């Protein structure tokens, strides 16, 4: 059933009130504190409808109601009025970055701290996905008989080391020629493009050094990123203890979530390619996250989407401030990451 304007007005007022006070909301509270234009009896009727429709749940001990995940979902998608960050708030965020050198790891670590302190939740940032980071320089170095060290310098500033084992001895001069050929042809492409498009084309063209043709497959395979190399930055555990102090089960759930780095990397990586700000509420997520919400957005290097950031907190978080905070921060981080990559 579609909600009427009356239903929407009551639902918004109740969710706003619950986010603010963190206790079940009754008709008297809505009548006294919100300019709804209905009598307490009419409000009670609407609240009963919203409960029947699955947007609210009763707390029998108090007589009030709280939003369900469905209620939060409708609130975020259709009712929330986004707060516009003030110039002072934007400057405060920007000043956090002026305190440090412009290095990628410092920027991302500071971002987790900024998101946490301004949202009263946990801030989280996923470092650049290595297969989406673009190549700045490649060097092949002879280590010993059958071993070559491949050094990949990425545009983000990340340096990757790969050991390649070959079936014959290659001189350093031969590897220098291969390195030069690779730099001439691979620079500016990401690892996915290099592995799936560029190197196959170079092997067909056969205009490079013979030694490249012999070890091209080994070079391509060695570039495959390891998900463990993606760095995770988290800040704000104390906020979670404060937010969930009366809800031990949900606190345990969110702490378990933050402790599972493999899950977090995979979860946030799904949003790297998607533009916009996304809100995941409870079981919208890939596993049970009862009582938990995540707001996330990607960040870019130039036009290339390379990572994701966001906040994790209780479902009753202040969405009208949290959504624009994540949006502004993602754009600011994109600007800084692009600047240091040049």
UniProtKB/Swiss-Prot annotation:
Negative regulator of class I heat shock genes (grpE-dnaK-dnaJ and groELS operons). Prevents heat-shock induction of these operons. Keywords: Repressor, Stress response, Transcription, Transcription regulation. Belongs to the HrcA family. The keyword Repressor applies. The keyword Amino-acid biosynthesis does not apply. One of its GO terms (molecular function) is DNA binding. InterPro entries: GAF-like_dom_sf, HrcA, HrcA_C, WH-like_DNA-bd_sf, WH_DNA-bd_sf, WHTH_transcript_rep_HrcA_IDD. GO terms for biological process: negative regulation of DNA-templated transcription. This is Heat-inducible transcription repressor HrcA. Pfam families: HrcA. It comes from Leptospira interrogans serogroup Icterohaemorrhagiae serovar Lai (strain 56601). It comes from the Bacteria. The lineage of its organism: Bacteria, Pseudomonadati, Spirochaetota, Spirochaetia, Leptospirales.
């Amino acid at each position: 059933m579609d909600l009427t304007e009356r239903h929407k007005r009551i639902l918004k007022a109740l969710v706003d009130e619950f986010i603010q006070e963190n206790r079940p909301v009754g008709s008297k509270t809505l009548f006294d504190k919100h300019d709804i234009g209905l009598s307490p009896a009419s409000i009670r009727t609407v609240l009963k409808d919203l409960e029947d429709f699955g947007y609210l749940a009763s707390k029998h001990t108090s007589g009030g109601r709280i939003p369900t995940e469905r209620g939060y979902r409708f609130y975020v998608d259709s009712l929330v009025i986004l707060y516009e960050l003030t110039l002072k708030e934007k400057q405060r965020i920007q000043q956090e970055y002026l305190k440090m050198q412009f290095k990628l790891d410092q920027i991302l670590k500071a971002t987790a701290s900024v998101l946490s302190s301004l949202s009263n939740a946990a801030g989280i940032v996923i470092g650049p996905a290595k297969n989406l980071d673009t190549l700045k320089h490649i060097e092949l170095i002879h280590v010993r008989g059958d071993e070559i060290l491949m050094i990949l310098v990425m545009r983000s500033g990340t340096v990757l080391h790969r050991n390649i084992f070959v079936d014959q001895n290659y001189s350093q001069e031969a590897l220098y020629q291969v390195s030069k050929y690779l730099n001439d042809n691979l620079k500016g492409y990401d690892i996915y493009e290099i592995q799936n498009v560029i190197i196959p084309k170079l092997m067909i063209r056969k205009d490079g050094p013979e030694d490249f043709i012999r070890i091209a497959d080994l070079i391509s395979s060695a570039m495959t990123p390891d998900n463990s190399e993606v760095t995770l930055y988290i800040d704000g555990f104390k906020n979670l203890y404060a937010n969930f102090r009366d809800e031990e089960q949900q606190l345990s759930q969110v702490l378990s979530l933050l402790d599972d780095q493999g899950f977090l990397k995979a979860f946030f990586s799904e949003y790297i390619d998607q533009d916009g700000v996304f809100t995941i509420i409870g079981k919208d997520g890939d596993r049970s996250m009862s009582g938990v919400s995540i707001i996330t957005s990607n960040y870019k290097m130039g036009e290339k989407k390379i990572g994701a950031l966001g906040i994790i907190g209780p479902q009753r978080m202040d969405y009208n401030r949290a959504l624009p905070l994540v949006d502004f921060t993602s754009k600011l981080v994109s600007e800084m990451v692009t600047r240091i990559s040049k």
